From Swiss-Prot:
Keywords: FAD, Flavoprotein, Monooxygenase, NADP, Oxidoreductase. FAD binds at G17, A18, G19, P20, A21, G22. Catalyzes the conversion of methylthioalkyl glucosinolates of any chain length into methylsulfinylalkyl glucosinolates. It comes from Arabidopsis thaliana (Mouse-ear cress). This is Flavin-containing monooxygenase FMO GS-OX-like 3.
Length: 450
């Protein structure tokens, strides 16, 4: 066991990002008695949930000199998980009155942003936030003592650069900014337009076009249907589909699902593994994102290798820097907000000395064992942080560390049922459901916090 910190000791902690992870991190750290400064590049809280019509100058978002747009939200986006499962555990995402509020069970991105602002207001988070302040560099400040961190930041308006020392840093900068792209044979000579879904906002630019989307994510499903309203043809290609896949989507006369692209050619054609050849105007990569920490300088100790952030104990602490450096929100295929809350409680309690960590050696042994297990199971490195149905074991482990209750059974059942419904009825799952008994259980729990 690592030496325990002084019980209930207060530390000066920097939180990077005022999105849904950073907001709840700030609350939990302050609740535990720490002093907190939150660094946020934008003018308001909300992170990726702040919608903007603006897109990047490079539609693929690979040009390092581009002006980066943080949000990946498109105008028609509605959440793909239920309202009940989406909210923080002790601040339910319930319907609120107001002319601009969205009362639907699967509301729009604007309703999520409004909820996050409600949360920030309720817990006085904004007083801890430095808005329009970008973190330029985070590095160990060994000369200042064990666990100290130097943060260099710039304020947009004042053009002031600060150099400050903190006891600990919690990284909450999200991972929906730096796109991953599919590797397509022949793409360098293909004459059409390529883009990433990060830069998709509205369907109108695709009117009368033949469009290919690559990916099987929720964004690929939603955007393909959004575009199909105006496009000439929409084709969705997916690596996980069998090679002979060619399916016309029910309810559409211009939307097909294919196997993966085999190659593209100078004449504008796209050849699929199923043997189909189609002349295409636009290829959109709906292929996810890379973890990206451009400000973090750990001298190679914390790395991103094929989308594995490591080494991280329980997806949060790099052993060499624990507990003074931590990450919130690394796992995916999860219930994000409740997970952020539990990770935040754990970090806050570890920093105060209330919750012990294993020794650095024991943490590294567990990490290496986990990596070996993934390798034996044939799981690619890029899926290291994918959880899916194992997420609930993780939440309950976090809860056990923090001394709080495990994930509610209704939340687990609702999440799993929604996944089944989404798979079976992708067109209607947001507006038709049959889990009213679980909704009732959820609202009985919510009454404890009203």
């Amino acid at each position: 066991m690592a030496p325990a910190l002084s019980p209930t000791r207060s530390h000066h902690v920097a939180v990077i990002g005022a999105g849904p992870a950073g907001l709840v991190a700030a609350r939990e750290l302050r609740r535990e008695g720490h002093s907190v400064v939150v660094f946020e590049k934008q003018k308001q809280v909300g992170g990726t949930w702040i919608y903007t019509d603006e897109v990047e100058s490079d539609p693929l978002s690979v040009d390092p000199t581009r002006s980066v747009v943080h949000s990946s939200v498109y105008r028609s986006l509605r959440i793909n998980g239920t309202r009940e499962c989406t909210g923080y555990r002790d601040f339910p995402f319930v319907v609120r009155s107001g002319v601009s509020r969205d009362p639907r069970r699967f509301p729009s991105h604007g309703e999520v942003l409004a909820y996050l602002k409600d949360f920030a207001k309720e817990f006085g988070i904004e007083e801890m936030v430095r808005f329009e302040t970008e973190v330029v560099k985070v590095s160990p400040a060994a000369e200042e003592g064990i666990g100290k961190w130097r943060i260099e930041s710039t304020e947009k308006e004042k053009k002031v650069r600060r150099d400050e020392i903190y006891d600990a840093v919690v990284v909450c900068n999200g991972h929906y900014v730096e796109p991953r792209l599919a590797q397509i044979p022949g793409i360098s000579s293909w004459p059409g337009k390529e883009m990433h879904s990060h830069n998709y906002r509205i369907p109108e630019p695709f009117r009368d076009k033949v469009v290919v989307l690559i990916g099987n994510s929720s964004s690929a499903e939603d955007i393909s249907r959004d575009i199909a309203r105006v496009a000439k043809e929409v084709h969705v290609a997916c690596r996980s589909n069998p090679a002979d896949t060619f399916i016309k989507q029910t309810g559409y006369n211009n939307l097909w699902t294919h196997s993966m692209i085999e190659s593209v050619h100078e004449d504008g054609s796209v050849v699929y593994q199923n043997g189909k050849t189609i002349s295409v105007d636009i290829i959109m990569h709906c292929t996810g994102y890379k973890y990206h920490f451009p400000f973090l300088d750990t001298n190679g100790i914390v790395t991103v290798d094929d989308n594995r952030v490591g080494p991280l104990y329980k997806d949060v602490f790099p052993p060499a820097f624990a507990p003074w450096l931590s990450f919130i929100g690394i796992p995916w295929q999860v219930l994000p907000f409740p997970m952020f809350e539990l990770q935040s409680k754990w970090i806050a309690g570890v920093l105060s000395g209330r919750i012990p960590l294993p020794s650095k050696e024991d943490m590294m042994i567990e990490i290496k064992t986990f990596y070996s297990t993934l390798e034996v199971q044939g799981i690619p490195k890029r899926y290291t942080h994918r959880m899916g149905n194992t997420q609930f074991e993780y939440y309950n482990w976090l809860a056990s560390q923090c001394g709080c209750s495990e994930t509610e059974e209704w939340r687990k059942e609702m999440c799993l049922a929604n996944g089944v419904r989404k798979e079976a009825h992708p067109e209607t799952y947001r507006d038709e459901w049959d889990d009213h008994h679980l909704v009732s259980e959820a609202y009985q729990d919510f009454s404890l916090y009203s």
